[in-house]
Amino acid sequence: MKKILLVDDSALMRRVVSDIINSDKRFHIEKEAKNGLEALEILRTETFDGVVLDVNMPKMDGIELLRALASEGISARILMASTLTMDGAKVTLDALELGALDFIHKPEWSYKCKENNFDKELLDTLYAVCNAKLKSVAKVKPVTRRTIEIQTGVEQLVRKKAASITGNRLVAIAISTGGPKSLQSVIPFLPEDLNAPVVIVQHMPVGFTESLAQRMDAISRIAVSEAKEGEVLENGHVYIARGGQHLKLVKSGRGSRVHYSDEPPREGVKPSANYMYESLSDSGYDEIICVVMTGMGSDGTEGIRNLKLNKKVYCISQEKNSCIVYGMPKAADKAGITDESVELGNIAQEIILHVGVMQNGC
């Protein structure tokens, strides 16, 4: 049974969330705290399998607690509970960069915790967080201009090999738990003249993916944006699927354009990587590079398996020891659809090697 620390300033919310967690035999709320300061005192002397952490609290909020834990070298598997607002999205991304493993959208009112499958999402996500590898989290370092410059030296060697690659290709990435932080080890190291579009399905609710795209664009050479309805995919551009909707890539000449669908969640997620991959079955690409990265569950595996029946596909899975949660890559590996397993820090160069760079600006 996993020991959980619950941190929330609302006594009523603590009671409701505690009841949900304790109803599952896998978990037990061991202790509660009503602000970050109380939680810090507890975490200085006790360890837990997971921490459910509110964002907005008096005395010390969730972000301040994460900074304090990092400053004191205290490791904890933390699940953030965030309200669904634009400010909430930005704060949540701050939390993920500071070491939180995942987040859930917490209803503003406690009585709504029984709606929209919140209880199932909470329990499933908490289970993934409790089983995440803290060592893998520590390996994912914040990106700086200096780290990009160092990696650029390696890229020059890769570019020489990639210069001769021709053809019409697409890179399609599936990622979930640990994604926002792990993507920082991939996207900023892709060149602006990458000879393919890159599409990312990151499991997130509506409102969060735009903030993620803006952050990724700010630290990357390649352009990054949230994919817009009707947009035609272009080489040298990264498109992040909008949260809360399924992304379908519709054939447009030899490429694709973006179309969103409001169909029900698939295998409990929306957007679904399976949905995106299967939409590429009649695409005009010569080859599709599928990348399955850290995350719980098996999203991506069925879609890639079906896609391989109709298209030339090269599947890269993130190597086990570099995953925060070895779930989605594990499913791909076990299904036998993986062509290569790659450590997180090498995924960008593998992408470059498989799609090449644009020659003479075209």
Whereabouts are the PLM-identified features?
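Extreme N-terminal starter segment of soluble prokaryotic enzymes
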Residues: M1-K3
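Conserved acid/base catalytic micro-environments in cytosolic active-site loops
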Residues: L5, A11-R26, E32, L37-E38, ...
